[in-house]
Amino acid sequence: MTSNPLDESMESLTVVPPAASPASRILVVEDEAVIRDMVALVLQQEGFTVDVAADGRTALNYFRSDSPEAGSVTENPDLVVLDLMLPAVNGLDFCRLLRRQGVTVPILMLSAKDTETDRVVGLEIGADDYLTKPFGTRELVARCRALLRRSQNQPAETPAVLRYEGLKLFPEECRVLLDDRELTLSPKEFRLLELFMRHPRRVWSRDQLLEKIWGIDFMGDSKTIDVHIRWLREKIEANPSNPSYLLTVRGFGYRLG
């Protein structure tokens, strides 16, 4: 009979007082229902909002604001508790995909594998912490809180370069490369693209884009956005009429990827 991975033998572990916001949202990605439900229950009892996914592909949808899993939530989860061995998209590939898209959400990886190599690979791929099964629920909660504190207290940094697939944008230099070929963009085109690249997959309405780029005092038409998106597509898309970077979300606005 398989032992319960949520071993409660760590009675001597010091209980860490709550430090993270009770509104913090945690995504639990685990294919074993017993473990998934138990982890979700423990975190909910600690005051967190919890979403669950049984595989990596479903979990990735929580980072797309137009997906059914994300619902009405427009922000990414604050933390991901991620099993290493998952169907569809495994834990390592999940980390790679998120980090490649510029998503910096803290990730706590869970695994029955306990070799140094496994831990190092997980951390180098993009996980922020690694917890070996079986584990105590107190340690799980303590590690979640530590990761949330670290991410909430970390000052926002302006990266030297923003990357999305073949695009590279240098904020300080106002330069954009597409497949290492430099592009010539107007100031508004540059700021639009920078906003999209800082928030990949987030859907922006025309009004939101106008306020962010043109300012709240702008008195023009929202079709200004459509015109600038068309110009951007002509510069970054292989086929502007069938874009792969700047996508239209019908009835709402635009997103990158």
From Swiss-Prot:
Domain Response regulatory, residue spans: 25-148
Organism: Synechococcus elongatus (strain ATCC 33912 / PCC 7942 / FACHB-805)
InterPro entries (UniProt xref): CheY-like_superfamily, OmpR/PhoB-type_DNA-bd, Sig_transdc_resp-reg_C-effctor, Sig_transdc_resp-reg_receiver, WalR-like, WH-like_DNA-bd_sf
GO molecular function: phosphorelay response regulator activity; transcription cis-regulatory region binding
Record function comment: Member of the two-component regulatory system SphR/SphS. Response regulator. Involved in inducible production of alkaline phosphatase in response to phosphate limitation as it is directly involved in the regulation of phoA transcription in response to phosphate limitation. Binds to two distinct sites upstream from the phoA promoter.
Keywords attached to this entry: Activator, DNA-binding, Phosphate transport, Phosphoprotein, Transcription, Transcription regulation, Transport, Two-component regulatory system
DNA-binding region: 159-257
Record note on modification: Phosphorylated by SphS.
Keyword DNA-binding belongs to the record: yes
4-aspartylphosphate sites (modified residues): 83
GO biological process, one term: phosphate ion transport
GO cellular component: cytosol; protein-DNA complex
Gene3D superfamilies in the record: 3.40.50.2300, 6.10.250.690, Winged helix-like DNA-binding domain superfamily/Winged helix DNA-binding domain
Gene of this entry: sphR
Protein name: Alkaline phosphatase synthesis transcriptional regulatory protein SphR
Keyword Cytoplasm: no
